[in-house]
Amino acid sequence: MALLPTGPPAPAIAVADSAAAAPRVPTARPLARLTVALQYAPELSTVRWASYTAPGSNVGVQLEYRFAPKWRLSAGVLRSVKRYAARGTDYHPPTQYWTNYYTIDEVEATCRITDIPLNLRYDVLQRARAAVFASVGVSSLLMRQEDYRYYYLYKGNPVARSWGLRRGSNHLLSILNLSAGYERTLGGRWAVQAEPFVKIPLGGVGFGKVKLSSAGAFLSLKYALWPAVAVAR
């Protein structure tokens, strides 16, 4: 007759779950190396931040190249309409221009410009479907049409006079671009982006060599042409 054990049962040997103990391997998400964007931005322009008139606008395209997981270089072409008012003391036309013989009180302007920006972007925060970024760069301005209205006194009476110029001066690397923004992937190769910005003059632009500043917000629809980079999330 077999004897039954009378002592306490032997402790069970715990078997480690190899799946649970294995270290988590980060998964990679694809990031577009080359993207194209359609852009629109309302903006306000001012000379020395003294006054504002009606808003202007920017419409254009941008090509963006990601050369590192958090770094991108972009170039674009924008058709820009800038409206501003300047004091006569901030408007400096060529020496022989007629306004130099009068005391100009104010100049109102509407300028149609080709803006060629070159910007460097850094992603401050990256998530699976979104990114927060900051950007810095420079713009070259090509003056296509400049329309001016001058206000001054003639023999004690207020006078307004208009004048326009087509295909005026070009100003290379004349604007400093600063911006920050938020990008979100919609699905597939599409993304949207919102980007508040300021443009700070590095020199005078236009016929009157005014120090023109602008502020606004770009809204962009982006499409990935070359999705080839991956980063861990």
Predicted regions and their residues:
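Extracellular/periplasm-exposed beta-strand and loop segments of Gram-negative cell-envelope proteins
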Residues: 52, 82-112, 143-171, 208-210
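Residues on the lipid-exposed face of transmembrane beta-strands in outer-membrane beta-barrel proteins
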Residues: 38-42, 61-67, 77-79, 118-122, ...
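Conserved catalytic residues of ABC-type ATPase nucleotide-binding domains
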Residues: 1-73, 80-84, 90-91
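Outer membrane beta-barrel transmembrane domains
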Residues: 162-174, 185-187, 214-233
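Repeated loop/turn-to-beta-strand initiation elements of outer-membrane beta-barrel proteins
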Residues: 70-73, 128-130, 187-192, 227-231
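Residues that define the transmembrane beta-barrel architecture of outer-membrane proteins
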Residues: 32, 53-57, 110-116, 130, ...
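C-terminal soluble domains/tails of integral membrane proteins
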Residues: 127, 135, 154-161, 196-198
